[in-house]
Regions:
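Short-chain dehydrogenase/reductase
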Residues: 28-123, 136-137
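Active-site loop of short-chain dehydrogenase/reductase
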Residues: 42, 97-98, 125-126, 171-185, ...
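Active-site-adjacent segment of SDR/Rossmann-fold oxidoreductases
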Residues: 64, 211-222, 267-269
């Protein structure tokens, strides 16, 4: 394994960030919140939903009979990667949900506003926002091209901020509204900064949005939470990590989808401003068989970034 990656076995507990604002294993505690039955009739807006974790979250909600806005920056097939927003919508419809494909670059403020308006016009409201779209480049300060720095900040931090901001007026009208950012707990161990400080700051920016917006909109009853994988997930992102991560040491996106599904069913007024790990959420809800999420059952798993 490369520095910053470790082979791990499973552990338990439901993760919550406590008042110090620093992630540490001593601060983890188990907590259960009341859950609603399912997401039937709810409307979700999912960014980066043409493949990977975004697609998996969309399909899990669709099985409940949810409405899902499938957004991604292109509606054309990628030459090397599977999936388009239109194919995801077809899968949503087949799973029992209702889908709407929207080509959206979240760096474009006007396009974000237009996309949200289109979603409201089509489905009549909005209940849940999944800020999944993200850019990654694990390079040090001297090696990272500045245009890639700009891309990570424009997509990860600013894009999630703008997306949330555009949706808040509609979420204020919803019953049990949630915003879920796919971002890590705020671990200030310097090891997570030294090799890719720009990416770390960009992802932590998403997490800081969770902290700030959870407090800002607490009285409105809008939940802002974060979800992060305990182990690396087999998505297109691992292809840029060369040999640092092998697919057989990963889990599938479905573990994140099931964990997100559990979080989104919780009472928004009671469950906000928290940082969850996928495996821990599912353990807290009774899941014991995690081999079904493994790309290769029985193989050692690679711990994800930002987790000691």
């Amino acid at each position: 394994p490369q520095p910053g990656w470790a082979l791990i076995q499973s552990s338990s507990a439901c993760v919550q960030l406590v008042s110090t604002g620093v992630y540490n294993t001593a601060m983890i505690r188990v907590e259960s919140c009341a859950m609603r039955a399912d997401l039937k009739g709810k409307t979700l807006f999912v960014t980066g939903a043409s493949r990977g974790i975004g697609r998996a979250i969309a399909l899990r909600a669709a099985r409940d009979g949810a409405n899902v806005v499938v957004a991604a920056k292109t509606d054309r097939k990628h030459p090397k990667l599977p999936g388009t927003i239109h194919e995801t919508v077809e899968e949503i419809e087949a799973a029992g949900g209702h889908g709407l494909a929207i080509r959206l670059d979240i760096r474009d403020d006007a396009a974000v506003t237009e996309a949200v308006d289109q979603a409201i016009q089509h489905f009549g409201g909005l209940d849940i926002v999944i800020n999944n779209a993200s850019a990654i480049m694990l390079k040090g300060t001297s090696e990272l091209p500045l245009n890639r720095y700009d891309l990570m900040f424009d997509v990860n931090v600013r894009g999630s901020y703008v997306m949330s901001r555009a949706c808040i007026p509609h979420l204020q009208k919803a019953a049990n509204p949630h915003v879920l950012n796919l971002s890590p707990p705020l671990n200030l161990n310097p090891v997570w900064f030294k090799d890719h400080v720009a990416y770390t700051i960009a992802k932590y920016g998403m997490s800081m949005c969770v902290l700030g917006m959870a407090e800002e909109f607490r009285q409105d009853g809008i939940a802002f939470n974060a979800l992060w994988p305990r182990t690396v997930i087999a998505t297109a992102a691992i292809s840029i990590l060369d040999d640092a991560v092998k697919p057989e040491n990963c889990r599938t996106p479905e573990i994140m989808a099931d964990a997100a599904h559990a979080i989104l069913r919780q009472d928004a007024r009671r469950c906000t401003g928290r940082f969850f790990l996928d495996e821990d959420v599912l353990r807290a809800t009774g899941t014991r068989d995690f081999d079904r999420y493994a790309v290769k059952p029985g193989a050692p798993l690679m711990r994800d970034l930002f987790l000691d």
